[in-house]
Amino acid sequence: MGNEKQILSADEIRRALVRIAHEIDERNGGLRDVVLVGIRSRGVPLAERIAAAIADFEGTRIPVGQLDITLYRDDLKLRGPAPRVRKTDLPIDITGKTVVLVDDVLFTGRTVRAALDAIADLGRPARIQLAVLIDRGHRELPIRADFVGKNVPTSLSERVMVRLRETDGVDEVVILRGSAND
């Protein structure tokens, strides 16, 4: 398409996720009490890929869960009368664990705020960290990612689109001219 520009290829996405996996291991002094929790929808396959990368270099599989934040969003009324609620699935009790929330794009911070509210209803982790593939700036809330694949300065008129094999049939990140992400 003429109005999109690729900013990450499949190989660049893979490398960014492997780097994030190593950073999670290093920052936490190991992975004994770490749980990855993907924010639906694209955060889930990213969390699975990070867990696979960790398994490759550590030889151990860490738990991966999925979090639906639909009912925790502050823009629920703006999204129409019947929001689509999907399953939240945490494989273990998160109380006392280090939860690493995983999402594709960090923009205003509102999605992460909703995820923090959802996590608080599910347990009391020792700490919560945030891993994102893309940080595009323009925060409306005081939220910062602990692990970032790539910082991509954007204008408010641009949209960052993460496409993944599992959901879109291709791995790439593109910038589109038009309306912004959440």
From Swiss-Prot:
Position of sequence motif PRPP-binding: 99-111
A GO term for molecular function: uracil phosphoribosyltransferase activity
Catalytic activity: UMP + diphosphate = 5-phospho-alpha-D-ribose 1-diphosphate + uracil
Alphabetically ordered keywords of this record: Glycosyltransferase, Transcription, Transcription regulation, Transferase
InterPro entries per UniProt: PRibTrfase_dom, PRTase-like, PyrR, PyrR_bifunctional
Keyword Cell membrane: no
GO biological process per UniProt: regulation of DNA-templated transcription
EC number: 2.4.2.9
Highest rank taxon of the organism: Bacteria
SUPFAM superfamilies documented for this protein: PRTase-like
Listed HAMAP family: PyrR
Similarity section: Belongs to the purine/pyrimidine phosphoribosyltransferase family. PyrR subfamily.
The protein's role, per its UniProt record: Regulates the transcription of the pyrimidine nucleotide (pyr) operon in response to exogenous pyrimidines.
Protein name (database record): Bifunctional protein PyrR
